UniProtKB/Swiss-Prot annotation:
Entry GO CC: cytosol
Higher taxonomy: Bacteria, Pseudomonadati, Myxococcota, Myxococcia, Myxococcales
A UniProt-annotated Pfam family: S1
Residues in KH domain copies: 562-621
Underlying gene: pnp
Protein name from the UniProt record: Polyribonucleotide nucleotidyltransferase
Length: 722
């Protein structure tokens, strides 16, 4: 097959799509290039359906090869290790964007693999993986209702930029990655520095318009490769008569169950209804062995129809009766309670409860040594702010093995971390590494948003001087014809009902983090603005409830947190603190019980739970790095005698010269007549030249001590010591 290329311009960048050159045995493969960044995306779908499952078996893996940036992995085996957080989050973004577009009921196991094979240090590769996944699926025979395309939208100096470079992103006050089709925004994930809802809507519509050429390029690529027909498959059976019978037997019972407020009571009743349904069908078929056997064989199908009844009833209840589970209105938020400082030895802690969702959150303050070090394509990255989200099985009353965090937990943690990162103080004002851990104690929807709220409370309890409090809210939108219902603070039952599910975090002034999944077309600007406005109202209500526990950060950090003091020294004196083989700094830390971190610019951070220990370490460092001041008198030690003068150590690592003419106000024939090695001598600094060489005077120091000016005293000159 001859390689086929199509190009599209997105903003200032040209994106190349190429197929037919590599990975030709995959069912679809596309080479995506922007600048010198290249991602290879492949898709393969099994020939046979996977039995015994009730979900679409899709796997997405995004991987960054370090050779793409000319780097050798730093691991022992010099191979890439477990997925980084960015790889996991990008895999989730591709999955969330593509999964809803596969044909309903498609049962074949499908895998998307996106591999970064070249990285130019300017153009990020996650958007290329997203577009490449759609393109590879679009030109394959896999039943996929695409195409879609990915784009990153930034706002730099008030102007929107499509696919900004890494340098532009560093200056942006808005940074979102999104996927869009011709008539709908499909997925949104990103953060911002307290931008308004209006700006966010403008950004999303700008992004949707920016991908049109990319969509055309994918269509052209499919046509050029022969417009391969989609493979046939047997969709799930839809027995209308059986479906209606299930509805008739369960509708009123489901209605009664959803009137119950308590989650476990409601779930228990819904489970009983399912059992009653199967029993009723068996009793109806009593005496007919063939019908009984059919019911047993179709039990999974019957349960599916029952789930459809629940889904249909809840949507009708919301759109027709304007009523939700528990009797709440569309904009009503569950009862909120907050508590801080409940863990006595923790640097900062909170317990945030909203309805039946609860998060226990702890904040720990660490030093620069506690920063997370991550090897990425851009080099070694150091993270000084982290939020880790944990979802133990007891939070939903289940029994499961405790394992390492899954993709969902990593994704929820990243969303909450992004929301709070925007209000964290800069390192020069708060030189701590900050780790937040959110453990979900119970869950009935919006647990990631509870982590945002609880995380903010624990930061303030820890005395972290955040810019402003942050809250998060999970929203849902249901659209039935012209009827639209926007739900604030959705429950777990409502989570999968919506045509648009979105989470918005921010301060009272604006949005700091957003996540959206939109499953339908026709979501207009007006609907987006209305949805985000309702989310803003809910967010401000939650902030008010949080303020009842703590409204501003504590004035001081916990007594159990390390005290960090940063001092500055001249960079050339760093070697004096470290010493040969690190001997000096090890001695200081051992004797004072402190942790010391030195930056290349001469910033020295000393940390210890005891301020007295910090001061002791500072004193030792100052003694090693103090500078001679012009006009100041010191008691030094003679280290070497020469014909022209004597070299005197003022303090460790700092020597000066007393010229023979500066030894006495009388003529000195030989230096050794006045001084001897090892002798202590009073001297005055009379000059320091640009090279740092120090001139000393014994005669001026003695005269000053005697209260008179010596004859022929030298004028002090030179540059002050730095």
């Amino acid at each position: 097959m001859t390689p086929i290329q199509k190009t599209a311009r997105v903003g200032a960048q040209e994106i190349l799509l190429e197929t037919g050159k590599v990975a030709k045995q995959a069912h679809g493969s596309v080479w995506v290039r922007m600048g010198d960044s290249i991602v290879l995306v492949t898709v393969v779908s099994a020939a046979e359906k996977k039995e015994g499952i009730d979900f679409f078996p899709l796997t997405v893996d995004y991987q960054e090869k370090l050779f793409a940036a000319g780097r050798v992995p730093g691991s022992f085996f010099r191979r890439e290790g477990r997925p980084t957080e960015k790889e996991t989050l990008t895999s989730r973004i591709v999955d969330r964007s593509c999964r809803p577009l596969f044909a309903e009921g498609y049962p074949n196991e499908t895998q998307i693999i996106a591999t970064v094979i070249s990285f130019d240090q300017e153009n990020d590769t996650d958007v290329l993986a997203l577009t490449g996944a759609s393109a590879a699926l679009h030109l394959s025979d896999i039943p996929f209702n695409g195409p879609i395309a990915g784009v990153r939208v930034g706002r730099v100096n008030g102007q929107f930029v499509a696919n900004p470079t890494l340098a532009q992103r560093a200056e942006a006050d808005l940074d979102v990655i999104m996927a869009a089709s011709r008539d709908a925004i499909v997925m949104v994930e990103g953060g911002a520095k307290e931008v308004s809802e209006q700006v966010m809507v403008d950004a999303l519509l700008f992004g949707q318009a920016a991908v049109r050429e990319l969509l055309d390029a994918q269509d052209a690529l499919r046509k050029a490769t022969g417009d391969k027909p989609r493979r046939a498959f047997d969709p799930p059976k839809n027995d209308v008569a059986l479906r209606e019978k299930v509805k008739a037997l369960t509708w009123e019972k489901v209605k009664e169950a959803y009137a119950r407020n308590e989650k476990h009571d409601r779930y228990g009743r819904l489970s009983e209804i399912k059992k009653e349904l199967l029993q009723a069908l068996k009793e109806e078929a009593a005496g007919d062995a063939q019908k009984l056997a059919a019911i047993a064989l179709r039990e999974k199908e019957i349960k599916g129809y029952y789930e459809d009844v629940k889904y249909e009833y809840m949507r009708k209840m919301i759109t027709d009766e304007r009523r939700r589970i528990g009797g709440r209105g569309e904009a009503d938020i569950r009862k909120i309670t907050s508590e801080v400082g409940l863990l006595p030895r923790v640097h900062g802690s909170s317990l945030f409860t909203r309805g039946e969702t609860q998060a226990l959150v702890a904040t720990t303050l660490g030093t620069a040594e506690d920063e997370q070090r991550v090897e990425m394509l851009t080099g070694m990255v150091f993270k000084r702010f982290m939020l880790h989200y944990n979802f133990p099985p007891f939070s939903v009353g289940e029994v499961k093995f405790l394992r390492s965090p899954g993709r969902r937990e990593i994704g929820h943690g990243a969303l909450a971390e992004r929301a709070l990162r925007q209000v964290m103080p800069p390192e020069d004002k708060f030189p701590y590494t900050v780790r937040i851990v959110s453990d979900i104690m119970e869950s009935n929807g919006s647990s990631s948003m509870a982590s945002v709220c609880g995380g903010c409370l624990s930061l303030m309890d820890a005395g972290v001087p955040i810019k402003a409090p942050v809250a998060g809210i999970a929203m849902g939108l249901i659209k039935e014809g012209e009827k639209i219902a926007i739900l604030s603070d959705i429950l777990g039952d409502e989570d999968h009902l919506g045509d648009m599910d979105f989470k918005v975090c921010g301060t009272a002034e604006g949005i700091t983090s957003i996540q959206m999944d939109i499953k339908i077309g026709g979501v207009t600007r007006e609907i987006l603005e209305r949805a985000l406005a309702q989310a803003a109202d809910g967010r401000k209500h939650i902030l008010g409830e949080m303020a009842k526990a703590i409204a501003t950060p504590r004035e001081s950090i916990s007594a159990y947190a390390p005290r960090i003091t940063t001092i500055k020294i001249r960079p050339e004196r760093i070697k004096d603190i470290i010493g040969p083989g690190g001997k000096t700094i090890k001695d200081i830390t051992a004797r004072t019980g402190t942790s010391i971190n030195i930056e290349d610019d001469g910033s020295v951070s000393i940390a210890s739970p005891s301020q007295d220990k910090v001061e002791a370490a500072i004193k030792m460092i100052r003694s090693l790095t103090q500078e001679a001041e012009i006009g100041k008198t010191y008691l030094g030690t003679v280290r070497k005698i020469a014909e022209f003068g004597a070299f005197v150590e003022l303090f460790p690592g700092t020597d000066g010269l007393i010229h023979i003419s500066e030894l006495s106000d009388k003529r000195v024939k030989s230096v050794s007549d006045v001084l001897s090695e090892g002798e202590e001598v009073l001297v005055k600094v009379i000059s320091v030249d640009r090279a740092g060489k120090i001139r000393l005077s014994r005669k001026e120091a003695l005269a000053e001590a005697a209260g008179k000016k010596p004859e022929g005293a030298a004028e002090t000159k030179g540059e002050p010591a730095k």
